[in-house]
């Protein structure tokens, strides 16, 4: 290929001038076109974590129940009975803006592979979706494509989609977020890792053929968007969930033998990343013969094959004597199987194609010795706490506005496009509890699963917002009765080269770390997505809200004893936790007063821990019939959601006089729960003994939510208003 290799070409590949000079020094010569491509993807933000790595190292990652933390394809935790949960969350933001259906679908496919490559059968998918303002011209198209893509892939591959989030804000108009999470279950003694070993062992390619889709997808995901984003459609991968299903079954069948030495999926940067990471982790070299790579298109170059991000592909190192056993399994499942290389003792990656050496690079500079930056930050000014605004329209009208607003409206339109029950092990479906609950087949165990983040809090105060995201995930797991075990994160931010954005990232990590340590909630896997910005024709950069999405997992000894939102008739409602009436950054402030200001609610991690441990103990003692944590919309929205979930009404008592009524009912105070119990007095007494604030709120019964003299609205009316937004926004039958 007669192309001049220089700093200008390297810059078009996403490398800086300094990085190009560094790679020339490493190579001792000008790189080939293929070598330049390999460096550009491995040193991209998406693959190298060069701006985030120093901050990520501060997060707590260890606990007695953690089997494998960050560094593998997914995190692994002990759930008892010799079993492990394997889970991770990952973004597909940039592709989902360019091509919403395929971007979202292949995001699901990629995270599934991260989990089953470790020997786990996937048992659940979740997703955290952030879209632009519903009034923005492009939002409806992106919502439609993303939701269909998530459902289309997950449904076909036979893994239930059991939970997640959907939020709207104008900051995502040009840059939606699609964060996908998969959870699998494996035997603890059957976990497969990615470190290659055994000089001379064969390197095997399995799955789909390689095409030209997705080339430079990793570098695209490491840059801002502009008005020409649509021209990048060729960098979006195209997925086939039916092939993925075959690949899952073939890999799990092979894993039941003793053939596999190491295994890695081909994700970002495709064959390049999988080969470099496997050999690098194992401290060996690797030689590839691209003539043997199964190709979907004719005349593919070495550069194209190494950088293609075609989906449904895996790379394995096998024991030589078991190669034919493996070949037979993949032939049975009608998948490609090719020996494309072997491990060496050189510490280098050598790539041959049509008799020529196309690349010969030392491995260390591509992986562990990739550039790492301690980017500059600026101090962020914490917003002042706001004075409680006057109530402009009354409690009942505000309640109806809130339950119908885009961020609180029923997500049934979304969930109904997902198969949430395939496999028959979903114990708590979306909307039925604060976290989804999935039974672990062959046991009584249950996994509680959630995703959480409140980006408007993070925008106002990234440290508090980071802590709150972790605390809310812990609280949602707790509300089901499960013991919270661990976290996977998906850190979505703007351009790290802007000091104010890097400060948001660093502060959010500090808050997350504080919360994880206080709650014994280690981070075992995750993903960083930077450069989530759109540049307008005038050159102005619009960053997303800082969005450190948290995926969390907990375990129940008995899935059948999980707790949901639906409250029975004739039960006391008890508030656990103290209400200050925190209206800063609340949905009430935004939807009723059209303001987005003030400090987010205080996150007191000691109180969070004490209250949550108390709630879990009461659930374990059989004293709790329903439980829901206070989050978006505040206390009255929490109660309304319990009314809508059950169809049972309730009568509430007046708010305490030391807090304005609207602040009491709509403040988004943290560390609080509403519990339905048969004996409210006993639960309040137990709380006092545990040094936990608690008070009786009222009693369930009838079909209306009633606050005497202030609110009287039927469960049916609440449901009607709550259900209206999505069908109206998307169009009936959309």
From Swiss-Prot:
Q: What EC number(s) has UniProt assigned to this enzyme?
A: 6.3.5.3
Transport found in the keyword field: no
Keywords carried by this UniProt record: ATP-binding, Cytoplasm, Ligase, Magnesium, Metal-binding, Nucleotide-binding, Purine biosynthesis
A Gene Ontology molecular function term of the record: magnesium ion binding
Cellular component (GO) terms are:
cytoplasm
Any single GO BP term? 'de novo' IMP biosynthetic process
Pathway annotation from the record:
Purine metabolism; IMP biosynthesis via de novo pathway; 5-amino-1-(5-phospho-D-ribosyl)imidazole from N(2)-formyl-N(1)-(5-phospho-D-ribosyl)glycinamide: step 1/2
Where does the chain bind Mg(2+) 2?
A: 114, 265
Looking up InterPro entries in the UniProt record yields: PRibForGlyAmidine_synth_PurL (IPR010074), PurL_linker (IPR041609), PurM-like_C_dom (IPR010918), PurM-like_C_sf (IPR036676), PurM-like_N (IPR016188), PurM-like_N_sf (IPR036921)
Q: Which positions are annotated as binding Mg(2+) 1?
A: 90, 527
Q: What is its main location?
A: cytoplasm
Per the Swiss-Prot or TrEMBL record, the active site comprises 46, 92
Compartments where found: Cytoplasm
The EC category is ligase
User: Does the keyword Nucleotide-binding belong to this entry?
Assistant: yes
Q: Which HAMAP family match?
A: PurL_2 (MF_00420)
Q: What does the subunit section of this Swiss-Prot or TrEMBL entry state?
A: Monomer. Part of the FGAM synthase complex composed of 1 PurL, 1 PurQ and 2 PurS subunits.
The similarity annotation says: Belongs to the FGAMS family.
Q: What is this protein called?
A: Phosphoribosylformylglycinamidine synthase subunit PurL
Q: Which gene encodes it?
A: purL
